[in-house]
């Protein structure tokens, strides 16, 4: 991952066009300026608010630390000193070491539940550990902490006085080990040279390396001693001399060498020739003084100097930038080349005076604070263990309960907030939800998830932050200001409402071409999450055309802009194609014809959006039309086709709603999302055969790909299986939303009655009388089989509908007649999935989907205890009514297992899989339905099998034809807390 952006940027003005935000006067070209970095409103990114350096440095408390200033080490030395003097501390001084020491805690570990945030290993009970308030309440091994911050004064740490004498001595031994004196060889590093003032002989101090270089033990780590003022002064003198030499060379090059000659010289030495003159000067000066840089070992792209390190400028794939960085770049040992054809007296004279052996570049040392933060960030990036980022607020019945969790969270390295704040990760309830509770109200207002108490226990047990979705008491309302985009479909597409032409125009169609596209780009390494909408709109009653553009950041209406240009049809098409090529790097025909389209690095990717084509004449006053459906069925149709239900589901999954028409992501786009998740699953499982740096870059690239294909408000690196499974469930829900959208439409002009929509399901749905035998059997089955551990809610049966989906019985009849062991079993699912289920039947996860999260492989899962399946309805207090299925399942001979086992299908001779639970329905209370179908409606009792890892039975079939949906139940959940 790229380092987070800094608060300030320092540079010499590239032109005289900028104005100072403080004094309002122009900033002259090449004048030192300081820019405060702010979120841009017209594009997805940060922009500097420029000021004269003198205007900023004349005010108090503007810049807090030199580490907050990007580009400070590339300024002329005198200008660097101005900023350092303003801040009041030079890098790596005793004062900064004292500052970091004041922010640390040291103690003996009270348990073995915490993990070191640097190495990821468990911190054993009874061993000394250190916490830095700079990084929250996470813990480190004392040795790991002192390796990252050798300048820290442990005697100033909070808790030092209460350590035992033996522990103090052990820690002080580590301090001595990690801080070698000047002129001595460190136990983990190389020997520092003394009394070498010539820049050509100075040795570059090594600092914390990128994770891409491996661990410190791979090559050794030279530690810059901060205990010696002489050493620090010597280093500063070398840095000053180096800076003066670099700037003298750049000034001479700018005076005597043209831009074309700079490019030719860089090309002759195998260096990057792109960019403006200032970048060419930087690269030439670096290469001429220290030798030509080698290429990135990960992706073979060019390296460039920035912020005390050399970074890769390339892309590890078409989806992601390369994250490689190093302080020890490979350089050519040959002399810097001057092309033979170049006739430049200055360069010829310089070449003759060039020394054969180049010195190493002296790199500025990190301040202890920056060293700690960066090392922690790098080493933690793919160690998902640890709870240091979790900030929890708790509402409990008693102070003792809250205090108990508070201590457990502290021991685990998590953070406890006494009250809900905007920085809180979640609010956890240790009691029944009280809507009038002040903290609950605040959480709702701040859109912070409200979770069950069990979430904390699971996080502590697994020692990582788990996804919130499975533990939500109620879904946080996370709609963006604009809500869902209004869609009016005309022809085969829809005009964007922001154009103002929805009522008077339509998307231009020219043969098979539909001039409308939505582009997306998510790049986690750059913090980019952008969309770009491009349309050609033709007037309904004329031939005039408009090119409409809208761009911004996904989920943030305050960032971005629009543009509407009127032009002729021919010019509008040309402009559309030009912009598409500019934004994607591909011609329009490649996407339109689905041939040879290649995602280009740093470019947008088109989303495959299916608006569908409405057929049939419009009808007015749909709501006033009489329905022929029974009242119970009419109410069910209202539930199934309520657009707000689908909108809430997409918001829960943090799908972008302001620019994504509801349900319009195509089936192909969702399949590509599954493919990206499968790639991530394979990378997460491949821990032995790949370098960590390469694996990290590939996971970032696959995450970029996923969030580009599936626009999300909060993209992030998908780096553990829990998060991966949440994304799989999200895509499964999107599949059903896509089916519902295609079947009945969600656009604002949809004019179908509920009777019409019911017919489109192609599934006969008949309400059962409450006094019939089948209804009573289903009710008994529901009331009897509530599992003892599912205490959060009870279930009330409201309606039962018999089902007969077109064609399902004919497929099932073969198995019904040939397989024994048929049972009536439960299946639960989200309300938004049922249009897809009723119209297409229960479906097995597609081949593109990862296998993560399926205990017994990809199949259809059923239960014999109602509450086991009811968990998957995902209802809440606000919407307490869900739907459940009772299906007749032909199980045949079952492959019985006591623990999760990955498989594609059961062994030969077996027709299904049964996971054996420790609690089962009482067999003596089973009933028979329609002669040969078993209804396991007995009360839950302990099973004879005690060693199983499963709490309750699970039944899995791997062929959809073994299932016949029989009943749809409308069930009300009564939440107890």
UniProtKB/Swiss-Prot annotation:
It catalyses: NAD(+) + (ADP-D-ribosyl)n-acceptor = nicotinamide + (ADP-D-ribosyl)n+1-acceptor + H(+); L-aspartyl-[protein] + NAD(+) = 4-O-(ADP-D-ribosyl)-L-aspartyl-[protein] + nicotinamide; L-glutamyl-[protein] + NAD(+) = 5-O-(ADP-D-ribosyl)-L-glutamyl-[protein] + nicotinamide. Pfam families: BRCT, PADR1_N, PARP, PARP_reg, WGR, zf-PARP, Zn_ribbon_PADR1. CDD domains: parp_like (cd01437), WGR_PARP1_like (cd08001). Residues 626-745 form the PARP alpha-helical domain. Residues 381-473 form the BRCT domain. The keyword Magnesium does not apply. One of its GO terms (cellular component) is nucleolus. The keyword Signal does not apply. Residues 504-604 form the WGR domain. Residues 291-335 are annotated as: Zinc ribbon. PROSITE patterns: BRCT, PADR1, PARP_ALPHA_HD, PARP_CATALYTIC, SAP, WGR, ZF_PARP_2. GO terms for molecular function: DNA binding; NAD binding; NAD+ poly-ADP-ribosyltransferase activity; NAD+-protein-aspartate ADP-ribosyltransferase activity; NAD+-protein-glutamate ADP-ribosyltransferase activity; nucleotidyltransferase activity; zinc ion binding. It is found in: Nucleus. Its EC number is 2.4.2.30, 2.4.2.-. Residues 227-365 form the PADR1 zinc-binding domain. Residues 752-977 form the PARP catalytic domain. Residues 177-199, 218-237 are annotated as: Disordered. One of its GO terms (biological process) is double-strand break repair. Zn(2+) 2 binds at residues 116, 119, 141, 144. Keywords: ADP-ribosylation, DNA-binding, Glycosyltransferase, Metal-binding, NAD, Nucleotidyltransferase, Nucleus, Repeat, Transferase, Zinc, Zinc-finger. SMART domains: BRCT, PADR1, WGR, zf-PARP. Zn(2+) 3 binds at residues 296, 299, 312, 322. Residues 254-288 form the SAP domain. Involved in the base excision repair (BER) pathway, by catalyzing the poly(ADP-ribosyl)ation of a limited number of acceptor proteins involved in chromatin architecture and in DNA metabolism. This modification follows DNA damages and appears as an obligatory step in a detection/signaling pathway leading to the reparation of DNA strand breaks. PANTHER family: DNA LIGASE, POLY [ADP-RIBOSE] POLYMERASE 1. This is Poly [ADP-ribose] polymerase 1. It comes from Oryza sativa subsp. japonica (Rice). The lineage of its organism: Eukaryota, Viridiplantae, Streptophyta, Embryophyta, Tracheophyta.
């Amino acid at each position: 991952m790229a380092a987070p952006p800094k608060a300030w940027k320092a540079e010499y003005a590239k032109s005289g066009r900028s104005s100072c935000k403080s004094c309002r006067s122009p900033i002259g070209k090449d004048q030192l300026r300081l820019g405060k970095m702010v979120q841009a409103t017209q594009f997805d990114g940060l922009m500097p608010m420029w000021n004269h350096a003198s205007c900023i440095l004349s005010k108090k408390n503007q810049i807090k630390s030199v580490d907050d200033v990007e580009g400070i080490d590339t300024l002329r030395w005198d200008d660097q000193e101005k900023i350092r003097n303003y801040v009041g501390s030079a890098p790596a001084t005793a004062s900064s070491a004292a500052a970091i020491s004041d922010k640390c805690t040291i103690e003996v570990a009270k348990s073995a539940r915490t993990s070191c945030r640097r190495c990821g290993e468990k911190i054993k009970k009874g061993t000394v550990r250190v916490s830095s308030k700079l990084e929250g309440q996470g813990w480190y091994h004392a040795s790991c902490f002192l390796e990252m911050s050798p300048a820290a004064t442990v005697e100033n740490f909070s808790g030092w006085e209460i350590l035992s004498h033996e522990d103090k001595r052990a820690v002080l031994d580590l301090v001595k080990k990690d801080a070698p004196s000047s002129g001595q060889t460190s136990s983990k590093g190389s020997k520092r040279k003394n009394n070498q003032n010539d820049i050509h002989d100075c040795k570059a101090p090594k600092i914390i390396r990128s994770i891409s270089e491996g661990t410190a033990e791979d090559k050794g780590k030279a530690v810059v001693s901060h205990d010696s003022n002489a050493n620090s002064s010597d280093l500063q003198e070398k840095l000053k001399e180096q800076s003066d030499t670099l700037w003298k060379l750049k000034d001479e090059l700018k005076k005597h060498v043209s831009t074309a000659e700079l490019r030719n010289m860089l090309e002759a030495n195998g260096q990057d020739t792109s960019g403006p003159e200032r970048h060419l000067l930087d690269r030439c000066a670096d290469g001429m003084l220290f030798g030509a840089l080698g290429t990135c070992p990960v992706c073979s792209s060019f390296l460039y100097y920035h912020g005390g390190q050399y970074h890769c400028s390339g892309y590890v794939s078409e989806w992601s930038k390369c994250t490689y960085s190093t302080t020890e770049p490979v350089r050519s040992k040959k002399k810097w080349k001057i092309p033979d054809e170049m006739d430049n007296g200055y360069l010829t004279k310089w070449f003759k005076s060039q020394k054969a052996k180049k010195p190493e570049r002296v790199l500025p040392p990190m301040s202890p604070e920056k060293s700690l933060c960066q090392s922690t960030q790098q080493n933690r990036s793919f160690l998902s263990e640890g709870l240091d980022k979790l900030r929890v607020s708790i509402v409990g019945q008693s102070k003792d309960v809250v205090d108990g969790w508070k201590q457990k969270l502290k021991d685990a390295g998590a953070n406890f907030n006494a009250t809900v704040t905007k920085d809180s990760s979640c609010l956890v309830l240790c009691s029944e939800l009280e809507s009038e509770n002040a903290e609950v109200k605040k959480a709702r207002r701040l859109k912070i998830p409200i979770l069950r108490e069990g979430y904390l226990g699971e996080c502590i047990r697994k020692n990582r932050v788990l996804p919130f979705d499975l533990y939500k008491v109620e879904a946080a309302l996370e709609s963006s200001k604009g809500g869902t985009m209004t869609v009016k479909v005309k022809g085969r597409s829809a005009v964007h409402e922001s154009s103002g032409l929805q009522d008077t125009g339509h998307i231009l169609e020219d043969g098979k071409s539909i001039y409308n596209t939505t582009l997306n780009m998510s790049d986690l390494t750059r913090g980019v999450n952008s969309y770009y909408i491009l349309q050609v709109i033709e007037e309904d009653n004329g031939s005039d055309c408009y090119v409409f553009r809208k761009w911004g950041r996904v989920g943030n209406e305050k960032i971005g802009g629009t543009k509407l240009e009127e032009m002729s049809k021919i010019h509008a098409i040309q402009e559309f194609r030009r912009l598409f090529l500019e934004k994607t790097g591909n011609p329009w025909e490649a996407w339109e014809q689905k041939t040879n389209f290649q995602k280009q690095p740093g470019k947008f990717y088109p989303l495959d959006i299916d608006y569908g084509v409405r057929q049939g004449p419009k009808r007015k006053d749909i709501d006033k039309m009489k329905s022929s459906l029974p009242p119970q069925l009419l109410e069910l149709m209202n539930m199934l086709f309520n657009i707000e239900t689908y909108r809430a589901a997409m918001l829960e999954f943090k799908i972008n709603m302001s620019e994504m028409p509801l349900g319009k992501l195509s089936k192909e786009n969702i399949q590509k999302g599954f493919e990206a998740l499968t790639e991530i699953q394979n990378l997460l499982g491949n821990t032995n055969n790949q370098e960590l740096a390469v694996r990290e870059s590939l996971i970032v690239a696959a995450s970029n790909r996923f969030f580009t294909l599936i626009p999300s408000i909060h993209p992030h690196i998908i780096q553990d299986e829990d998060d991966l499974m949440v994304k799989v469930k999200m895509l499964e829900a999107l599949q059903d939303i896509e089916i519902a959208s295609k079947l009945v439409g969600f656009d604002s002009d949809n004019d179908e009655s509920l009777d019409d929509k019911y017919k489109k399901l192609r599934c006969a749905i008949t309400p059962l009388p409450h006094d019939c035998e089948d209804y009573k059997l289903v009710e008994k089955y529901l009331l009897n089989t509530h599992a003892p551990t599912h205490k959060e809610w009870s279930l009330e049966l409201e309606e039962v509908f018999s089902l007969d989906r077109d064609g399902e019985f004919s497929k099932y009849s073969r198995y019904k007649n040939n397989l024994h062991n048929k049972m009536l079993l439960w299946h639960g699912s989200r309300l938004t999935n049922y249009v897809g289920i009723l119209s297409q039947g229960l479906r097995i996860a597609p081949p593109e989907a990862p296998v993560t999260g399926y205990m017994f492989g990809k199949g259809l899962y059923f239960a014999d205890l109602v509450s086991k399946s009811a968990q998957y309805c995902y209802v809440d207090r606000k919407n307490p009514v869900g739907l459940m299925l009772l299906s007749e399942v032909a199980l045949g001979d079952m492959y019985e297992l006591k623990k999760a086992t990955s498989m594609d299908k059961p062994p030969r001779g077996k027709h299904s899989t049964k996971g054996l639970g420790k609690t089962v329905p009482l067999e003596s209370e089973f009933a028979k339905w329609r002669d040969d179908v078993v209804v396991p409606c007995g009360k839950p009792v302990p099973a004879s099998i005690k060693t199983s890892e499963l709490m309750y039975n699970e039944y899995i079939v791997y062929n959809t034809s073994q299932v016949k949906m029989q009943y749809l139940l409308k069930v009300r959940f009564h939440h107890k807390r």
